[in-house]
Amino acid sequence: EVFNDVRLLLNNDNLLREGAAHAFAQYNMDQFTPAKIEGYDDQVLITEHGDLGNSRFLDPRNRITFKFDHLRKEASDPHPDDSDVALKSWRDACDLALRAYVKEHYPNGVCTVYGKTIDGQQTIVSCIESHQFQPKNFWNGRWRSEWKFTISGSTAQLVGVLKIQVHYYEDGNVQLVSHKDVQESITISGEAQTAKEFVKIIEQAESDYQTAISENYQTMSDTTFKALRRQLPVTRTKIDWNKILSYKIGKEMQNA
């Protein structure tokens, strides 16, 4: 909404792009913005893990690179990509398992799985994004999570970060911004079995986090928010402001 207003007031996309290009790019990568590429069914997330520079990004599932306009949030100019073929079987197995999980738990969710060599280590990085924007109902919300592990030895450390951001602004302004860091051990065996355990750990961690958030909100509603509510006056009745002039205080105010 704010961006659209600024764009309308400025009425110059070139100037807006020049002045805020870096901010838009960083925002889209931080927020795991979904992108739809013409000719391909599945969306891909815009993340730092797929950033190739010069506004080009990697779509590892479709094995292409593409150009992304951060201002218009439009993808274009897809080209085939054959990088990191050594990790293809691992990436594909984790992607297949994660897609099934996201489809079941996040109706509007998108996931992207990368197979990368980081500091000489073969690494799987998985990103999940799901959002619901309801500006007409005065609320918006987004879920993001990122998980990574290295393929080395019989066990590895699975590291994750979970993020929730919700904004409700009807007759008030309430925001929830929360994140949680997770570390779990994962057994490295065959691709399919590792992918299965990978998703099992993700499902448990994300479920526990969402349950904890819900329980915390219930506790706050029963305690913190209740304490903030305006108490009734000593008469134990609300003032009818439409009849204020019929009250003694209203007449005194009128005669003042």
UniProtKB/Swiss-Prot annotation:
GO cellular component: cortical cytoskeleton; F-actin capping protein complex; WASH complex
Keywords associated with the record: Actin-binding, Cytoplasm, Cytoskeleton
SUPFAM superfamilies on file: Subunits of heterodimeric actin filament capping protein Capz (SSF90096)
InterPro entries: CapZ_alpha, CapZ_alpha/beta, CapZ_alpha/beta_2, CapZ_alpha_1, F-actin_cap_asu_CS
Tree of life domain: Eukaryota
Cellular localisation: Cytoplasm, Cytoskeleton
Coiled-coil spans in chain: none
GO biological process: actin cytoskeleton organization; barbed-end actin filament capping; cell junction assembly
GO molecular function, one term: actin filament binding
Similarity remark: Belongs to the F-actin-capping protein alpha subunit family.
Cited function: F-actin-capping proteins bind in a Ca(2+)-independent manner to the fast growing ends of actin filaments (barbed end) thereby blocking the exchange of subunits at these ends. Unlike other capping proteins (such as gelsolin and severin), these proteins do not sever actin filaments. May play a role in the formation of epithelial cell junctions. Forms, with CAPZB, the barbed end of the fast growing ends of actin filaments in the dynactin complex and stabilizes dynactin structure.
Assembly and interaction partners: Component of the F-actin capping complex, composed of a heterodimer of an alpha and a beta subunit. Subunit of dynactin, a multiprotein complex part of a tripartite complex with dynein and a adapter, such as BICDL1, BICD2 or HOOK3. The dynactin complex is built around ACTR1A/ACTB filament and consists of an actin-related filament composed of a shoulder domain, a pointed end and a barbed end. Its length is defined by its flexible shoulder domain. The soulder is composed of 2 DCTN1 subunits, 4 DCTN2 and 2 DCTN3.
Name assigned to this protein: F-actin-capping protein subunit alpha-1
Record lineage: Eukaryota, Metazoa, Chordata, Craniata, Vertebrata
